[in-house]
């Protein structure tokens, strides 16, 4: 099964992230959200908090498709 990392940086556009994640998951692609910050909690452009699966630092050595 394919696997993809979706990177979430502070100020990300939530609709772009959520729609992308939704489409990939509907296609049976494993998706892991990664925060490009010290914490898994990331705040979007519209101040909506989202908690990523992991941080980029925690998964830096993992390979994705």
Ranges and model annotations:
Residues 1-65:
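Extended, subdomain-level signal for the structured scaffold at the beginning of enzyme domains
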